[in-house]
Design a protein with these regions (language model features):
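Polytopic membrane enzymes that build or remodel cell-surface glycoconjugates and lipids
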Residues: 1-495
């Protein structure tokens, strides 16, 4: 009877989390860049040998996954949502496996996996399709650690393969050899076996060799070190961002008020660290995992968003589960239910945003389609929708003529699919320094370029002076629906 109850609880947990993926997902932001790659590149393997990430990063495996999903799904979002759910569930399961290999009790390891699976921030990261980069990387890292700690040598060899997979997904996983050495150290300590730095480092040499090989290939493909041209936050700003990421990893990003998230998150982290001190070896591993996985994050410049903390959250959930180890089963169930409840609240909030976003894009698409029918090709759309040009051009219901048009949103640093005939005339609208660093994402014959950042963007009057044929569309929200209005004539009269 007890087993049936636990199986029922697990099924309810899975269904509750799956609900978010069914209702709160759509294509946003960088998702459109990956979709254009999948739509235009005939061979996805080209990302392994040439720069398809604008000189920023070398991450060919996630691009291969996106290519496959786009081709299989025909652009239907539910296929991407299903893949994201499976990846998130896989990572949660691997948290359990890693916990058991390290010596965590079965109940504690399972609890850590459930906490990770239910946590709002980790689910939020998984709900953004572009964060599949982070999910794939996390799955590969966790799998590599699990195999590395296995007693069978032939399985340990496969951890090197998974290390290569992790590196080809995201650069932050280059800390994997350190995680492997740390895992071996604490595993030996927990088992009361003698240990030395040399014994822990030697087995990681093949992984280090793969890391060096990856860096060489990356430099050759990107023709340099890569990286984004985004401005860097000051050192203290990045420190605050790291702390904020940890706090939100055990609470939620929204719709909780920030002060509530900080108060609850800091209290929870302090309590977990204090309550788990009696199991120093296991708690030490969890804390070191968090610190090691945080080390490469400040390189990003602005460390804002749940996706950055997906891998560090593994250590946080192991620490929380360890702190709950001596409590009753009811307390553990309550902890999972609390995170699940926060997640459902956050998911409902996001589902509303997704619904409004889809309505806004649909309304803008209708306005652009009407303009195209009248021979217009340049549009400015106010309404706060980033990368609107890409979203509209990826809509299969739009006329083919949209490929030769340009939709300029009022969101700085948005990306546009730039037709060759407009390249010179629209150059003044582009970011300086360029977005991406190489000047453009080049997929097939298409060029995707970033518009100016907020502080350098020209005002609308200057844009109209240079582009007098520009049509001005305005998105409005009234009576529960979005509509679009052509305000070109009224704006021109106001200028006169």
């Amino acid at each position: 009877m007890r087993r049936v109850a636990w199986l029922l609880a697990a099924a309810l947990l899975g269904l509750a989390v799956a609900w978010d993926f069914a209702t709160a997902t759509t294509f946003l932001g960088d998702d459109h860049l990956f979709r254009v790659f999948a739509r235009l590149e005939a061979n996805p393997l080209v990302a392994f040998a040439s720069d398809k990430h604008g000189g920023e990063y070398y991450r060919p495996l996630p691009m291969l996954l996106w290519w496959l999903l786009e081709r299989v799904s025909g652009g239907r979002a539910w296929v991407f949502a299903l893949a994201a759910f499976v990846l998130h569930a896989l990572c949660a399961g691997l948290v359990v496996v890693v916990g058991r290999r390290l010596g965590f009790a079965a109940r504690t390891a399972v609890l850590a996996g459930c906490l990770f699976f239910a946590a709002p921030s980790e689910r939020e990261a998984a709900l953004w399709f572009a964060a599949s980069t982070d999910l794939l990387a996390a799955a590969a890292v966790l799998g590599a650690v699990a195999l590395f700690l296995d007693d069978r040598k032939w399985l340990r060899a496969f951890s090197v393969v998974l290390a290569a997979v992790a590196f080809l997904c995201k650069e932050t996983t280059l800390v994997l050899p350190v995680l492997l050495a740390v895992a071996r150290w604490f595993c030996a300590q927990n088992q009361g076996r003698p240990r030395s730095v040399r014994q822990c480092l030697r087995p990681t040499l093949p992984h280090c060799g793969v890391a060096v090989s990856y860096l060489i290939v990356r430099a050759l493909v990107l023709r340099g070190l890569g990286g984004a041209n985004d401005p860097l936050a000051p050192w203290w700003g990045r420190a605050v961002q790291l702390l904020a990421g940890l706090v939100h990893s055990v609470t939620a990003y929204g719709p909780l008020p920030e002060w509530v998230a900080w108060l609850a998150g800091v209290s929870l982290l302090v309590w977990a660290a204090a309550a788990s001190r009696r199991r120093r070896a296991l708690a030490g591993f969890a804390l070191v995992w968090v610190m090691v996985t945080l080390v490469p994050l400040p390189v990003a410049g602005w460390v804002v968003g749940a996706r950055y903390f997906y891998l560090p959250a593994v250590g946080l959930m192991l620490l929380l589960a360890l702190a709950l180890e001596t409590t009753s089963a009811l307390a553990s169930v309550f902890a999972v239910a609390l995170l699940l409840g926060f997640g459902l609240l956050s998911g409902h909030h996001r589902a509303t945003e997704v619904r409004l976003y889809r309505q806004a894009v649909a309304a803008a698409s209708a306005g652009v389609a009407e303009g195209l029918a009248h021979g217009h090709r340049l549009f400015f759309v106010s309404g706060g929708v980033k990368d609107l040009d890409l979203a509209i051009k990826l809509d299969k219901d739009m006329p083919e003529a949209v490929r030769g048009a340009v939709v300029i949103p009022d969101v700085p640093a948005s990306f546009i699919w730039l037709p060759p005939e407009f390249a010179d005339r629209l150059d003044f609208l582009l970011a300086r320094p360029s977005l991406p660093p190489s000047g453009a994402y080049r997929f097939g014959e298409a060029r995707l370029v970033g518009l100016a950042r907020r502080e350098e963007a020209p005002d609308l009057d200057e844009v109209l002076t240079r582009l007098p044929e520009l049509r001005i569309l305005r998105l409005g929200y009234k009576a529960g629906r979005f509509s679009v209005e052509d305000r070109t004539e009224s704006y021109m009269r106001g200028r006169q």
